[in-house]
């Protein structure tokens, strides 16, 4: 990590003509009050019983798929390619079982509680990403997770970070930066990787800027975020 940060820092320094003010472009962090709120144990929200039964089956299907994937990984390690390939069909069947449970809930969405909907959107986004390679659909479902009034706070914060990563992967750098900034404002614990990601996002954003001034400002923000990542890594 430290070697990578040093390379990034050196590279970023070469891209700017002057060293920016130390705090320039660094994100606002969560307040002590917000961190306390996130870490305070609250009464767990409860899904409607019929929804909970379906979601449990979704979780069981994901567990099954995960076990099969691990078996497949071990078979590949042992160079048993034929047996490993056969696992693809089993994984596909397990995923299809989980997706079927979600699909059966969708016609009822409008009548469900907000918390119920948030969990359905969350698991659908997981299927979109992990098994279906449907990034636009995953983004759409994560946005719905964020927008639901009764979404669990920690799940909403997690969704901010995932949305940032997904938008960046789709070259929507403005949205990626915006969701990362939201994440920083709400995250109880910030690691160097998050600053590296924000720094990379600003570098990419700089390449899209038509104004030289805006491009330079984005590069300065990138430099400071990578430098902050190095500070945190060195402090460990």
Give the role of each language-model region.
Residues 13-123, 130-140, 154-158:
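N-terminal leader/linker segments that initiate helical-solenoid repeat arrays
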Residues 49-54, 113-122, 152-162, 175, ...:
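Generic helix N-cap/helix-start motif at coil->alpha-helix transitions
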Residues 57, 64, 124, 163, ...:
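Structural register within alpha-helical repeat arrays
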Residues 61, 128-129, 160, 167, ...:
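Residue at a conserved register position within TPR or TPR-like alpha-solenoid repeats
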Residues 103-106, 143, 181, 220, ...:
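Alpha-solenoid helical repeat scaffolds
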Residues 107-110, 147, 185, 227, ...:
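Conserved structural position within tetratricopeptide repeats
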């Amino acid at each position: 990590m430290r070697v990578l940060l040093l390379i990034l820092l050196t590279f970023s320094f070469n891209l700017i003509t002057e060293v920016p003010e130390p705090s320039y472009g660094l994100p606002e962090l969560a307040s002590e009050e917000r961190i306390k709120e996130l870490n305070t144990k609250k009464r767990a929200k409860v899904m409607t019983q019929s929804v909970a039964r379906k979601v449990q089956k979704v979780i069981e299907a994901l567990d099954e798929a995960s076990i099969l994937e691990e078996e497949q990984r071990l078979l590949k390690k042992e160079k048993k390619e034929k047996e490993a390939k056969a696992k693809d069909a089993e994984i596909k069947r397990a995923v299809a079982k989980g997706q079927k449970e979600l699909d059966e809930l969708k016609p009822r969405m409008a009548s469900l509680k907000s918390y119920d909907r948030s969990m359905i959107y969350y698991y659908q986004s997981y299927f979109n990403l992990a098994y279906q390679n449907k990034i636009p659909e995953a983004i759409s479902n994560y946005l719905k997770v964020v927008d639901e009034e009764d979404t669990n706070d920690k799940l909403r914060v997690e969704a901010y970070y995932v949305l940032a990563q997904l938008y960046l992967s789709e070259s929507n750098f403005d949205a990626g930066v915006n969701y990362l900034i939201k994440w920083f404002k709400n995250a109880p614990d910030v690691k160097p990787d998050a600053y590296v990601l924000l720094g990379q996002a600003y570098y990419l954003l700089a390449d899209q800027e038509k104004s030289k001034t805006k491009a330079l400002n984005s590069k300065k923000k990138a430099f400071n975020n990578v430098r902050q990542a190095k500070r945190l890594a060195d402090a460990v």
